[in-house]
Each structure stands twice: as structure tokens, then as C-alpha cells.
Design a protein with these regions (language model features):
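Alpha-helical elements of Rossmann-like donor-binding domains used by nucleotide-donor carbohydrate transfer enzymes
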Residues: 17-18, 98, 135-139
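Pocket-forming structural segment of enzyme catalytic cores
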Residues: 20-22, 40-118, 123-131
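Flexible gly/pro-rich beta->alpha loop and the following alpha-helix that scaffold active-site loops
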Residues: 1-31, 37, 43
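Active-site phosphate/pyrophosphate- and oxyanion-stabilizing loops and adjacent acidic/basic residues
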Residues: 37, 68, 138
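Conserved strand-to-helix beginnings and helix N-cap segments that scaffold or border functional pockets
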Residues: 12-16, 93, 133-134
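Acyltransferase
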Residues: 128-144
Length: 144
């Protein structure tokens, strides 16, 4: 589990090196917020700063790829808590990462890797704002 944190992935100590090891060893991983951004960066995606930070902000997800095991068997609406000021740039998403949900503005809120046990969520499933957090974590654990 790659947890949330301040800043951007390249400023997060050995995070990017750790992701390299995770990928090489095919270790199942879930990136949350900063972890989501770091996983995307590790595969070549770029980040984009939002015009205003979203801290403690509820968002309704639109699931755009039903193949994401994290989001299966969760009844809509999926409301999630956001605490970030950066997002993955959708124009830079590599082919091996599949965006699976978006917010109202079209920002990527989750993705999974086409061939590896890698998932990322921009939001915080552990937040009291998120109505789908426990189910999402159970779904992830079932993939491990």
C-alpha cells in the first residue's frame, strides 16, 4: 500500500525507487493519492496542478472502465473524499495504465495496470467522506 503524503512523488524520499522494486517483483500494490500519482509517474505519466486544492472535498465518481476489480460490486453512487492539489494528466497516460473512473471535470480518479497487480486511486478510501472505502479495500485485498 503506497499511502498519501504531501508534495509530489519525486519529493517523497525513496518512493520512486521502491516502486521500481515493486514492479520488478510483481508485488500487488494500491497507491492512494500521492501513491496513485507516483505509480502513474513510474510508468511515464505526467502530473498537472489543479487551479485550487481539493481538501476534504466530496466527489461522485463516474466509473469509465468496468474491468477495474477495485470498483466491482460497489453500488453507485460512489462518493469519495479528496485531499490533493495535483492530478494525473490524462493526455500523458501510458497505454499499460487504464483509467477506470473520473470526477465531474474529467480528472482521472482511479486506474489499473493492464498486466500487473497495480491499482491507483486519487481519492482517500479511508476518509469518512468516502462511502465505498471498505468495499474498495476488500476488493483490493481479494486481488492480492
Amino acid at each position: 500500500l503506497l499511502s498519501p503524503g504531501p508534495g509530489i512523488p519525486e519529493e517523497a524520499g525513496d518512493l520512486m525507487a521502491a516502486i521500481g522494486q515493486i514492479v520488478r517483483q510483481r508485488i500487488p500494490v494500491l497507491g492512494i493519492c500521492l501513491g496513485h500519482q507516483a505509480l502513474a509517474r513510474a510508468f511515464g505519466a505526467e502530473l498537472r496542478q489543479l487551479s485550487a486544492p481539493l481538501h476534504g472535498h466530496p466527489t461522485t465518481l463516474t466509473v469509465t472502465d468496468a474491468g477495474d476489480l477495485l470498483l466491482q460490486k460497489i453500488a453507485p453512487p460512489l462518493i469519495v473524499g479528496r485531499y490533493h492539489s495535483w492530478v494525473v494528466d490524462p493526455d500523458s497516460m501510458p497505454e499499460e495504465l487504464i483509467a477506470s473512473s473520473h470526477d465531474e471535470a474529467g480528472h482521472i480518479m482511479s486506474f489499473y495496470h493492464r498486466n500487473l497487480p497495480i491499482h491507483g486511486v486519487q481519492f482517500h478510501p479511508e476518509s469518512c467522506i468516502s462511502n465505498c472505502g471498505p468495499a474498495l479495500i476488500r476488493n483490493w485485498l481479494a486481488t492480492c
